[in-house]
């Protein structure tokens, strides 16, 4: 596996080859990331992974400085997966000048849910992803469904900018107890780790309640959301949201759409101690 930090060197290595299958990451790799590498390979070699902890998507009180950086272990994992190139730029490599141009997602998608509680987050995500796409010029790019809203936004960005890349979703990988794998799970104490699967259990309960409705309507969904939030809060979680939304655009469904069988997804974010976890479940 070649490890490259310079953009021009990356382009030189990729020139004349098939267009890559690309998996962007922030490192601290776990089985969820590695499953995305395998999915990328199914869409063709060479597979290019990137590791870059993107300052632009962290807020002033978030964990940029403490975000786990495990480069040597990550390299070993990627080598075992047969990744062709690891693109691991420094900030100076990727942002040689201040990044004054930013990609601002539309408010109806970028300022809701995660965007409401992490202002500027998706602006930072879209900016770095577009820049990485420019560097790698991939045929396909793989993003995990655990970050459901991010996947939707990147897909829409690629479509609106007519980028020649297909966005492939990767299924969420979970621990045996149901907790979605995440680099931030390492922040959890032993007691918090034992409690953390409750987040997925609550989503499963919400799903069962929605499927059990004889007639779906807006008021019924709001009541289910309210009770689920209360359930988490009663277990010492600090929920930011539990929201039942349309899969297509993450907007709340109308009564007419619900009665027509609009596909739905449940999305949540909640803090357990100092660790903020996100998860989702399609209906």
Swiss-Prot record:
> Which residues are listed for (R)-pantoate binding in this entry?
57, 150
A GO BP entry: pantothenate biosynthetic process
What's the catalysed reaction? (R)-pantoate + beta-alanine + ATP = (R)-pantothenate + AMP + diphosphate + H(+)
Q: Which UniProt keywords apply?
A: ATP-binding, Cytoplasm, Ligase, Nucleotide-binding, Pantothenate biosynthesis
Which residues are recorded as binding ATP? Answer: 26-33, 144-147, 173, 181-184
Q: Which InterPro entries match?
A: Cyt_trans-like (IPR004821), Pantoate_ligase (IPR003721), Pantoate_ligase_C (IPR042176), Rossmann-like_a/b/a_fold (IPR014729)
The GO cellular component terms are: cytosol
> Which top EC class applies here?
ligase
Where does this one sit in the cell? Cytoplasm
Query: From the Swiss-Prot or TrEMBL record, what is one GO molecular function term?
Result: ATP binding
Q: Which residues are recorded as binding beta-alanine?
A: 57
Q: In which pathway does it act?
A: Cofactor biosynthesis; (R)-pantothenate biosynthesis; (R)-pantothenate from (R)-pantoate and beta-alanine: step 1/1
User: One Pfam family from the UniProt entry?
Assistant: Pantoate_ligase
| Record-annotated active site | 33
Q: What is its EC number?
A: 6.3.2.1
Q: Which HAMAP family match?
A: PanC (MF_00158)
Q: Which NCBIfam families match?
A: cyt_tran_rel, panC
Q: What does this protein do?
A: Catalyzes the condensation of pantoate with beta-alanine in an ATP-dependent reaction via a pantoyl-adenylate intermediate.
Q: What else is known?
A: The reaction proceeds by a bi uni uni bi ping pong mechanism.
Which PANTHER family would you find in this protein's record? CYTIDYLATE KINASE/PANTOATE-BETA-ALANINE LIGASE, PANTOATE--BETA-ALANINE LIGASE
As for family, the record states: Belongs to the pantothenate synthetase family.
Binding partners and assembly: Homodimer.
Tell me what this protein is called: Pantothenate synthetase
Q: Give the species this sequence originates from.
A: Polynucleobacter asymbioticus (strain DSM 18221 / CIP 109841 / QLW-P1DMWA-1)
Q: Which gene encodes it?
A: panC
């Amino acid at each position: 596996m070649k490890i490259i930090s310079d953009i021009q060197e990356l382009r030189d290595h990729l020139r004349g080859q098939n267009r890559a299958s690309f998996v962007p990451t922030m490192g601290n790799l776990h089985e969820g990331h590695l499953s995305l590498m395998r999915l990328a390979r199914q869409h063709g070699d060479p597979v290019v992974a990137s590791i870059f902890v993107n300052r632009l998507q962290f807020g002033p009180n978030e964990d940029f400085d403490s975000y786990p950086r495990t480069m040597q272990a990550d390299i070993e994992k990627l080598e075992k997966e047969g990744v062709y190139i690891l693109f691991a730029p420094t900030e100076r490599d990727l942002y040689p000048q201040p990044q004054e141009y930013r990609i601002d997602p539309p408010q109806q998608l970028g300022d809701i849910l995660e965007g409401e509680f992490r202002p500027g987050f998706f602006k930072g995500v879209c900016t770095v992803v577009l820049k990485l796409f420019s560097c790698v010029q991939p045929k396909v790019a793989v993003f995990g469904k655990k970050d459901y809203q991010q996947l939707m936004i990147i897909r829409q960005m690629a479509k609106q900018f007519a980028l020649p890349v297909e966005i492939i979703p990767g299924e969420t990988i979970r621990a045996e107890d149901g907790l979605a794998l995440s680099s931030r799970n390492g922040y959890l104490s032993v007691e918090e780790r034992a409690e953390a699967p409750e987040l997925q259990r609550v989503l499963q309960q919400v799903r069962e309640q929605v499927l059990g409705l004889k007639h779906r309507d807006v008021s019924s969904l709001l009541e289910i959301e309210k009770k689920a939030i209360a359930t988490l809060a009663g277990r010492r979680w600090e929920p930011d949201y539990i929201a039942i939304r349309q899969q297509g655009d993450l907007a709340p469904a109308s009564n007419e759409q619900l009665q027509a069988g609009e596909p739905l997804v449940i999305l949540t974010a909640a803090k357990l101690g100092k660790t903020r976890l996100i998860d989702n479940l399609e209906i």
